[in-house]
Amino acid sequence: MKKKILLMMSLISVFFAWQLTQAKQVLAEGKVKVVTTFYPVYEFTKGVIGNDGDVSMLMKAGTEPHDFEPSTKDIKKIQDADAFVYMDDNMETWVSDVKKSLTSKKVTIVKGTGNMLLVAGAGHDHHHEDADKKHEHNKHSEEGHNHAFDPHVWLSPYRSITVVENIRDSLSKAYPEKAENFKANAATYIEKLKELDKDYTAALSDAKQKSFVTQHAAFGYMALDYGLNQISINGVTPDAEPSAKRIATLSKYVKKYGIKYIYFEENASSKVAKTLAKEAGVKAAVLSPLEGLTKKEMKAGQDYFTVMRKNLETLRLTTDVAGKEILPEKDTTKTVYNGYFKDKEVKDRQLSDWSGSWQSVYPYLQDGTLDQVWDYKAKKSKGKMTAAEYKDYYTTGYKTDVEQIKINGKKKTMTFVRNGEKKTFTYTYAGKEILTYPKGNRGVRFMFEAKEPNAGEFKYVQFSDHAIAPEKAEHFHLYWGGDSQEKLHKELEHWPTYYGSDLSGREIAQEINAH
């Protein structure tokens, strides 16, 4: 009897031990295993996940995110994860290849920027912004790294809120049973971001100096969202002493504008700092791009918020001191694309430059797809125009009921599609006309005339695509009418605009935002 009782007790003990093991396993399995790319993504994701998951980071401190390439081990980590979160394809350029290589369909892939439009980055040749309602343009570039679009959105607290919201929404959709916790965690984290945003706004909205000079042009969104101007300089790094020639030119530049600080992405070596101070009369300071924190720094309590507040404190060394407006060392705005060229540079073009199937952007203006563009333009104008005013202006410019145009360069035909009805005409080249705009920049209209006597309103057409010589167009503004070419030359307010028919509305919005 005793043996039976002991056997029963043993079985019960084993059963409870097994139950406990199972419970622990279920608890562990209930946690979402998330792999992130680099520090800001890790930080934001942890803010959303809380205690409902295990969040890891591929790139350790000291790794350059722009140059990172995942190892086979890294790819396996992603493969074995429940979710993979990254910032943007313009930052982690390798992600598209990794997506294709994944064999597991269970991995939820989250893009931090979501549908956020980005501004132009280095490598994007056609950057312009409309500064005066007559297509004034401005080129943007970033020192050191080559991006079609600038991915450094996390350096603006205002935009970081959107990144956290995107991560929250994607993970909540993938794990509905945890959505309530994710939303609560995100709400707490976003409140902290809103406080940081308020601190930046309060400190910088009335800045005495609106421009700051940096060696690492990663702070474009921060500058845009808080009313500042980021001035990027070349030929200066935190660990290599500038050449004598560079010191000489930098010294002149610093003295011309009374520049007191040049910002680096990390502490400049003592030798570089001393050289800058002695030879150029300027101090070196650090604005962290927040691409990584060491374990030691994190254990010491440093995080996104402490570093961003330190950045603000350092930035105020410049913004709190009144001074003259600081301009870039070189004026990069007067390019051909922006409307500055010599007459002899203008060459004849053929209709084949515009061959293809093209769609009007007007429907995307109407359905709100382009709304982010107007917000960006309003901020770039620094109070000159509101987002609503920009939308009204472009509504007039883009408005058309010709939703599609098909151009056959070989046959020299243009097919206009209106409400599904097609009209095709054959065109001959009629020359070019250089127009001068009120701001002093210029544009070229390339003119064509229909052979058919019944072409009506499509008798005369003029292309404008910011190019002045033969090249394949990426988009264009088109003017048409039945009276004369001369009458069309006077049309400056209405310029129906067309992009490739293979592009989505968001892709078109992104291209427009980079112009």
UniProtKB/Swiss-Prot annotation:
Coiled coil: none
UniProt entry keywords in alphabetical sequence: Ion transport, Metal-binding, Signal, Transport, Zinc, Zinc transport
Annotated region (His-rich loop), positions in chain: 129-148
Alphabetized InterPro entries for the sequence: AdhesinB (IPR006129), Bact_metal-bind_prot9 (IPR050492), Calycin (IPR012674), Lipoprotein_PsaA-like (IPR006128), ZinT_dom (IPR015304), ZnuA-like (IPR006127)
GO biological process: cell adhesion; zinc ion transport
Pfam families, alphabetized: ZinT (PF09223), ZnuA (PF01297)
Bilayer-crossing regions: none
Residues binding Zn(2+), per UniProt: H66, H152, H216, E291
Source organism, top-level taxon: Bacteria
Entry's Gene Ontology molecular function annotations: zinc ion binding
Signal peptide location: 1-28
Region described as Disordered: spans on this chain: 125-148
Domain notes: The His-rich loop facilitates the closure of the zinc binding site and is required for zinc acquisition.
Function, as annotated: Part of the ATP-binding cassette (ABC) transport system AdcABC involved in zinc import. Binds zinc with high affinity and specificity and delivers it to the membrane permease for translocation into the cytoplasm.
Family from the record: Belongs to the bacterial solute-binding protein 9 family.
Protein name: Zinc-binding protein AdcA
Organism in which the protein naturally occurs: Streptococcus pyogenes serotype M18 (strain MGAS8232)
